[in-house]
Every structure is written in structure tokens, then in C-alpha cells.
């Protein structure tokens, strides 16, 4: 077993992410008729939230060989105009001029980055055609994550709010903003940040809140909200102070070997959840909200005592007279009420993490229906999906880049979710299928996933887990797809995605992406192959002349040594 060590941050990619992207024009041409340009920033921006987007635009245009002046040359203008929804924008292009119109700063930001794409695709020259481009997001929340921020899990368990490392350098935030990310998530717990009449203040609370406030303020300059990832209310052991002082918060039935789950039927539990979440969001009102795995990953409330395929009653359910979905509903409403009492615009994303391929119990199939209307109901997009490979049907759980989806269970949940917003958990940079690479170049798969989400009226997306969040092609594709209405063709979208980076070679590049797409969908649709097969740790496998029959180790867990040679483990569920 490896020793518990803090993560090393002297990776070359970390230093690379601190540098602003160097403007590159694939079809560089001599400057057109306008050797000069000027910016008319008429959009009202009292907090200077657009300063970073304007500076990004200036960097690209100056790299194209243009000189900024007060009045002469090409005019780039921003102005306020009523739009249909938040972040929507218009680009009105004509020879010598582009007007970016929106009703809010984030619409202007999105329009500026679209203009940069057009500038790059035009070889570092201003677009001269007459055209009006109108875009609005169908996904209002688009969450990413820093590739090198700590995961805060055993055995390393590093808390990024207690160190002095800047996990969000300006250059990285600019990349996220250009790629359409408007939220990042970091890991914490309720009792680390909040206080209530039931709990004492954590000794490091003020330190955490101070850094959290700094990060939230910095990210806001790029139109990015900070979200708190949690598994709450987290079940507690018998020796936990909260359990010993307030047993009324917890379910009455004791399950041997299991922590004590919270009881949402208790008014004290409702009060506790409201108070502690209100305190957090009153302390840092700029937060976007909470992403909470409320069921499936670790025990939280009493429904956690049941597996996702188990329809038997909860042990003490006869005392509260509530069905399992009503119990969950009460907990979610309390958390959401507390969040909004602290910050009216913040939201709760209730993540029902059900990764297993087995058919779901009826209470799990009803989660979407019972989720409160002001809470986003988020489900895994691919879990439980089916594919025909090697002549037979395969059903796999967890996350998949290579499976377009959605799984039928996700489709059913989305159709059931008529009383509130629906969210999706995707894995679109890379997944456990091939973890060592930054991303897999399959934007066609992303297109098909996002088109399905559009048709199912999905409003929120979590684009990665601890892996698969490195900036690049797939993040760029997802950000642009979030603003699609899919009235055009897939081929047109892929060409538009390629042109700012590949220019005259874009058609060939799109053909290469299509080949990658066909090939990657042949990846064995087997959870054991995804987790343990050689593509992730091949060089560390044992190749002894005589087999040791050591089990294969999970390469995503730092407390296991790589290796093993029982290769039959990876294929038994597939062939």
C-alpha cells in the first residue's frame, strides 16, 4: 500500500495552464482593408466583469496585426439589447463592423468569444460578410472542474480550501470561459463551512470561507460560478458529536455495520439542513450552488439504506408513514430552502448516482417525479445503457464516452421530469475507458449526446468527474453545443468547430474525427474492461514467465500498487 502523500503539483501541464493561450491563425493572411480597429464598449458594466473578455479579444486582434485606435478602422461594438434568456446574444456582422448585443454581461462574453472564433477562422482577419448570428443556451448550467485540484478523498484527502495553492490561474479561467464553462465545482462538507444551532463551528471554517470567497470573486471575472460538491447530509458513526448530542436527527432503526443515516421526517433534521445551508450561502452569496449526491454514492438519508434495485420498505418507515420518495423530497426541499435563504439565485443539483446496470427499483424510477420543482434532478446519462457487441447485448453501468446514449432509464427520468429542471452527468473529455490522455477526439459523440439532451429538455450538465476535465477539443465542442438549436447539420457544426484551429484543413480533420468516432464506439462495453484493462496501466502489469495470479488493481486509487496478471477478470463479462 502506498503512503498517504500530498499530490505533487510540479507537472508540466500545470505550468502550461498558467499561460494564456497563444493566438494561432491556421490560414494567416495579410490584413484586410482595416489595419486599425477600435472597441466601443457601450454595454453597461459597472463591476467590470467583461474586462477579462475584452482583454482576450484585444490579445487575439493585436496578434492578427491590427492596431487599436480610438476611432479609426474596424469597429467592434457591444451594446445592451433585450434577449429571450440569460446568456443569449446577437452578432450583427457587416463590412467594417461587428455589433455584439445582449441583455446581460454573460451574453456579451459569449458573443466576444464567438467573434474571436470567427476572427481565427478567417485567418486572423476581421470577417467581412453580412450576417446576423443569434445564439441562446439550452443548457443554462455547464459545470467543469480543475484537472489538478484535490479530490479530497481517502487516502490523500487534501482540502484545497486549506492550502495556499491557486488552482484557478487566470489563463485557465479564460480557457474555461472561452469553452463555455460557467461553473466549476470543488469538494467540501456542510459542517466544514456552516454552523447551526445543532453544531459547533469547525476550527478551520473561517479559513475555508475566506479562500472560498476569494476563489468565487476571481472566477466571477470570467463569468464562472463556484459550486460546492457534497454528499450530504453525510451519515455519521456512533461516536460523532452530532449523533451523540442530537439522536433525534437520525433514523431510529440501527443497521449493523452501517453509519447512522439522517431522518428527513424529523423536524429537527429539516431545521438543521436549512440553518447550515443558509449560513454557508449567507457567508459566500456569490456561490452558484451545491451539487449533492443525495443517493447512491455514500449513505446520507434513510433511503440510502436500500440498494437501487431493492423495493423493500425502510426499516423504520412505518413510523413516519411517508413513502421513500416523500422522505427524499423533504430533505431536498430543506436544503434548497436554506440555500435560497442565503442567496436567492443559488441552486441545488440533486444527483442521484445509480451507476449499476441492474434494473431500478420503483422508488428510484420515481426520483425525477418527486424532486422539488426548484431543484435540478441530475442522473447519469449513460448508466444502464445497452449495446450489441460480439453478437450479444451488453449492459454497462457508470460513465462512458464511447456510448452515445442516453440509457433508457435516463430517457424515462427526463420524460417524467415535467415539474422542474433536469440535469445530466456526462463524461466527455475522457472516461475510465482511457484515462491517461487529456481527451478523446470524438466531438461527433458529443454532438449526439447534446442533441439528445436538447430533445429531452435538459437544462444542466456536469461534464466530468475527477477525470476527463482537461481543456481541449471536447470541452470546446461541449461549450458550443450548449448553444445549439440543432437546426443545422452535424457536418456544419463539426466544420465550424474545426475552422478556428485548422483552417483550410478542417474538412480533412472532420473526416479524421469521424473515423475516431466509429472506432471508439467499438470499445468493449464492459465495466470490468473499462476499469481494469491494460489501456490505463499496461506498463505496470506483471509479465512473468510463470503467472503469479495476482488480482488486477484499480488504477484510479492511489493506495493500490499497479500490476496484477489475472487478465481473465477483464473479459469475463464481455465475451
What residue ranges belong to the model's regions?
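Short, solvent-exposed secondary-structure boundary motifs
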Residues: 58-60, 74-85
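Feature activates predominantly on carbohydrate-active enzymes
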Residues: 3-12, 16-36, 44-46, 53-56, ...
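Short phosphate-binding/catalytic loops that engage adenosine nucleotides
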Residues: 66, 181, 224, 344, ...
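Short acidic low-complexity segments
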Residues: 63-75
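Zn2+-dependent metallopeptidase catalytic core
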Residues: 50-66
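Residue-level preference for non-acidic, small/hydrophobic
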Residues: 104, 574-575
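Substrate-binding groove of N-acetylhexosamine-processing glycoside hydrolases
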Residues: 1-27, 34, 40-42, 46, ...
Amino acid at each position: 500500500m502506498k503512503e498517504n502523500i500530498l499530490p505533487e503539483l510540479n507537472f508540466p501541464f500545470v505550468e502550461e495552464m498558467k499561460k494564456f493561450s497563444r493566438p494561432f491563425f491556421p490560414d494567416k493572411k495579410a490584413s484586410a482593408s482595416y489595419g486599425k480597429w477600435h472597441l466601443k464598449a457601450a454595454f453597461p458594466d459597472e463591476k467590470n466583469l467583461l474586462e477579462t473578455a475584452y482583454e482576450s479579444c484585444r490579445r487575439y486582434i493585436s496578434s492578427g496585426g491590427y492596431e487599436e485606435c480610438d476611432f479609426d478602422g474596424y469597429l467592434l461594438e457591444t451594446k445592451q439589447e433585450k434577449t429571450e434568456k440569460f446568456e443569449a446574444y446577437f452578432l450583427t456582422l457587416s463590412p467594417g463592423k461587428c455589433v455584439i448585443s445582449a441583455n446581460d454581461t454573460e451574453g456579451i462574453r459569449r458573443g466576444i468569444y464567438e467573434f474571436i472564433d470567427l476572427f481565427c477562422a478567417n485567418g486572423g482577419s476581421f470577417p467581412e460578410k453580412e450576417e446576423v448570428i443569434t445564439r441562446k443556451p439550452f443548457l443554462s448550467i455547464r459545470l467543469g472542474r480543475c484537472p489538478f485540484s484535490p479530490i479530497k478523498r481517502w487516502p490523500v484527502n487534501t482540502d484545497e480550501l486549506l492550502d495556499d495553492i491557486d488552482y484557478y490561474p487566470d489563463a485557465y479561467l479564460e480557457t474555461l470561459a472561452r469553452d463555455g464553462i460557467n461553473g466549476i465545482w470543488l469538494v467540501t462538507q456542510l459542517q466544514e463551512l456552516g454552523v447551526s444551532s445543532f453544531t459547533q463551528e469547525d476550527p478551520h471554517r473561517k479559513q475555508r470561507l475566506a479562500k472560498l470567497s476569494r476563489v468565487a470573486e476571481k472566477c466571477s471575472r470570467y463569468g464562472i460560478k463556484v459550486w460546492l460538491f457534497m454528499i450530504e447530509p453525510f451519515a455519521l458513526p456512533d461516536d460523532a458529536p452530532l449523533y451523540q448530542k442530537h439522536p433525534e436527527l437520525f433514523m431510529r432503526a440501527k443497521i449493523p455495520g452501517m453509519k447512522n443515516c439522517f431522518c428527513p421526517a424529523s423536524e429537527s433534521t429539516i431545521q438543521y439542513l436549512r440553518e447550515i445551508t443558509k449560513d454557508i450561502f449567507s457567508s459566500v452569496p456569490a456561490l452558484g450552488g451545491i451539487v449533492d449526491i443525495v443517493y447512491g454514492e455514500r449513505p446520507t438519508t434513510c433511503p440510502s439504506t436500500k440498494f437501487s434495485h431493492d423495493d423493500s420498505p425502510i426499516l423504520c418507515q412505518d413510523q413516519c408513514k411517508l413513502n421513500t420518495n416523500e422522505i427524499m423530497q423533504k430533505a431536498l426541499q430543506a436544503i434548497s430552502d436554506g440555500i435560497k435563504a442565503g442567496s436567492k439565485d443559488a441552486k441545488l443539483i440533486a444527483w442521484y448516482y445509480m451507476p449499476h446496470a441492474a434494473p431500478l427499483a420503483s422508488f428510484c424510477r420515481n426520483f425525477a417525479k418527486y424532486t422539488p420543482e426548484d431543484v435540478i434532478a441530475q442522473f447519469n446519462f449513460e448508466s444502464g445503457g445497452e449495446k450489441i457487441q460480439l453478437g450479444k447485448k451488453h449492459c454497462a453501468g457508470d460513465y462512458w464516452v464511447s456510448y452515445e446514449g442516453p440509457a433508457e432509464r435516463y430517457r424515462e427520468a427526463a420524460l417524467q421530469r415535467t415539474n422542474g429542471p433536469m440535469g445530466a452527468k456526462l463524461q466527455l473529455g475522457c472516461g475510465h475507458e482511457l484515462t491517461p490522455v487529456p481527451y478523446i477526439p470524438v466531438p461527433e459523440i458529443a454532438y449526439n449526446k447534446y442533441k439528445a439532451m436538447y430533445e429531452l429538455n435538459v437544462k444542466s450538465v456536469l461534464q466530468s468527474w475527477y477525470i476527463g476535465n482537461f481543456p481541449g477539443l471536447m470541452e470546446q465542442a461541449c461549450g458550443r453545443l450548449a448553444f445549439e438549436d440543432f437546426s443545422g447539420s452535424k457536418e456544419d457544426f463539426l466544420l465550424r468547430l474545426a475552422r478556428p484551429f485548422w483552417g483550410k484543413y478542417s474538412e480533412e480533420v472532420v473526416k479524421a474525427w469521424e473515423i475516431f468516432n466509429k472506432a471508439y464506439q467499438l470499445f468493449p462495453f464492459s465495466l470490468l474492461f473499462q476499469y481494469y484493462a491494460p489501456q490505463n496501466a499496461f506498463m505496470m502489469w506483471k509479465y512473468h514467465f510463470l503467472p503469479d495470479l495476482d488480482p488486477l488493481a484499480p488504477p484510479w486509487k492511489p493506495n493500490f500498487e499497479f500490476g496484477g496478471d489475472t487478465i481473465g477478470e477483464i473479459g469475463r463479462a464481455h465475451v
